[in-house]
Amino acid sequence: MAPQQNGAEVDGIHTGKIYSVSGPVVVAEDMIGVAMYELVKVGHDQLVGEVIRINGDQATIQVYEETAGVMVGDPVLRTGKPLSVELGPGLLNNIYDGIQRPLEKIAEASNSIYIPRGIATPALDRKKKWEFTPTMKVGDHIAGGDVWGTVYENSFISVHKILLPPRARGTITRIAEKGEYTVEEKILEVEFDGKKTEYPMMQTWPVRVPRPAAEKHSANQPFLVGQRVLDALFPSVQGGTVAIPGAFGCGKTVISQSVSKFSNSDVIVYVGCGERGNEMAEVLKDFPELSIEVDGRKEPIMKRTTLIANTSNMPVAAREASIYTGITVAEYFRDQGMNVAMMADSSSRWAEALREISGRLGEMPADQGFPAYLGAKLASFYERAGKVQALGSPPREGSVSIVGAVSPPGGDFSDPVTSATLGIVQVFWGLDKKLAQRKHFPSINTSVSYSKYLTILDKWYEREYPDFPRLRDRIRQLLSDSEELDQVVQLVGKSALSDPDKITLDMATLIKEDFLQQNGYSDYDQFCPIWKTEWMMKLMMGFHDEAQKAIAQGQNWNKVREATQDLQAQLKSLKFEVPSEGQEKICKKYEAIQQQMLDKFASVIDE
């Protein structure tokens, strides 16, 4: 027999009462019929919360806002729906908090730099009108995921496809004409089994449920980020998963910001999860100023970006939600047939939020106090990446790439979050504290980093840049040989080495200082296109090969090195060419250097 219901009713929905409060975790009683992960409003301020455990008529709720002032006996209002995000025109060029409340709108409404408690501002602007163009007509059959109209979003993404929710279907009985409408106006009516349903341009989707796709494809296009060391040695694919673990001050945030600024994705979702507020402020300041070229005109990068800010002083529980909010927004753009990159900075703070809530729930702690289900939670997040065939027609392919920064305490890669992440992701960009202290940025440790996508991408390289895989393998071999030689030099000194080994060491130094290092704050080096990377590899390895040939023909390396000082200076200044001058002009300069190198070595060998 069910316990007697003694709670009040508001608008026909049963309300419970608060039984206990412990930080962000609230226990409510008299909650018969509540569902797991249902959205509830807690207390008189109607704070947003989510049910995470049910025991009899008691429900445990994690509250996404500050719970100060909430008392035992306060009402808990059920909404009857899960925590969901609004998806539609207006997501781009916007900044939200972890549960998709628009921060700019809240600032305008409250005239405060703080978010008032219990504020309920819709995520998408309800007043703004969008230019809608229908792509279907009355009488057409329509199924989940079909594109039934397009909207002009902004000058960067001119076609925002309007999709039917995945579980809907039927025959169109009414569709609006071309014109301007708001996101909540019902502009489509569909009939199925005699029942008519109306749809607006926007749709809602529960954040914990992955959006369905027709089928998953294997990824085969590279995810280029404009950092030479990453594009050349450890590339990822569109739809790949990347982890960037590193101690404090190693440059994780600079790498993830440069990935979001310069990657070849169509849309960027940047989730600042439990990191410093200054970093989000920096993104907000930098992105509108930075531009990227689209069809011959410059557009600010902010127009292709959605920011989700959940800084370290915001409520802990909302950190967990922010990651899911971000990935759901990314999946929505993926379903339109776009390549989306999602940055999560940092997943360690997310895991710490899980640990805190798990501790308050009294769950059994596992390694370092993290919950036993940490690995499963991380996997369920990273597995939402990938390249898919979207639902519905017309057929379209889209992808979600996830780049997760991990901050292990003290840079210890055996930390549970790092080790769980490395078991899931396919690309590992390991940052090294020693390199960062030497001001070698990006501080990627080439001996521990890896990418499992190299063989998948070989077909693309064969088609576009045939020499690339060979040059990449040779540079990796050269770097690993130089590490072994470094140990020999420490024991017996450089003079004891043979000439070919001296060349290897000198070339490795040149590659480390002038190829792997990159100044993210300069106009010539903040972004390096793949053709420039290939030419730099070609010229540096060309110098290495010519030098080895000269030694094989009896020359002395010291003499050869002195005779080719000017060539080495040119190799060191290859990176100073500004990509915006144009590929053709810069490639001609590089070809001239290549010819000069061949002539110089020919004259050195003849001496």
From Swiss-Prot:
GO annotation, cellular component aspect: fungal-type vacuole membrane; vacuolar proton-transporting V-type ATPase, V1 domain
Enzyme class of the recorded protein, top EC level: translocase
Annotated membrane topology: Peripheral membrane protein
Superkingdom: Eukaryota
GO BP, sorted A to Z: ATP metabolic process; intracellular arginine homeostasis; intracellular histidine homeostasis; intracellular lysine homeostasis; proton transmembrane transport; vacuolar acidification
InterPro entries on file: ATP-synt_VA_C, ATP-synth_a_Xtn, ATP_synth_asu-like_sf, ATPase_a/bsu_AS, ATPase_F1/V1/A1_a/bsu_N, ATPase_F1/V1/A1_a/bsu_N_sf, ATPase_F1/V1/A1_a/bsu_nucl-bd, ATPase_F1/V1_b/a_C
Catalytic activity, as annotated: ATP + H2O + 4 H(+)(in) = ADP + phosphate + 5 H(+)(out)
Positions with a binding annotation for ATP: G246, A247, F248, G249, C250, G251, K252, T253
PROSITE patterns assigned: ATPASE_ALPHA_BETA
Major localisation: membrane
Gene3D superfamilies: 2.40.30.20, 2.40.50.100, Bovine Mitochondrial F1-atpase, Atp Synthase Beta Chain, Chain D, domain 3, P-loop containing nucleotide triphosphate hydrolases
GO MF term set: ATP binding; ATP hydrolysis activity; proton-transporting ATPase activity, rotational mechanism
Localization: Vacuole membrane
CDD domains: ATP-synt_V_A-type_alpha_C, ATP-synt_V_A-type_alpha_N, V_A-ATPase_A
Record EC number: 7.1.2.2
Keyword annotations: ATP-binding, Hydrogen ion transport, Ion transport, Membrane, Nucleotide-binding, Translocase, Transport, Vacuole
HAMAP family: ATP_synth_A_arch
Role description: Catalytic subunit of the V1 complex of vacuolar(H+)-ATPase (V-ATPase), a multisubunit enzyme composed of a peripheral complex (V1) that hydrolyzes ATP and a membrane integral complex (V0) that translocates protons. V-ATPase is responsible for acidifying and maintaining the pH of intracellular compartments.
Subunit record text: V-ATPase is a heteromultimeric enzyme composed of a peripheral catalytic V1 complex (components A to H) attached to an integral membrane V0 proton pore complex (components: a, c, c', c'', d, e, f and VOA1).
Family, per entry: Belongs to the ATPase alpha/beta chains family.
Name this polypeptide is given: V-type proton ATPase catalytic subunit A
Gene name in the database record: vma-1
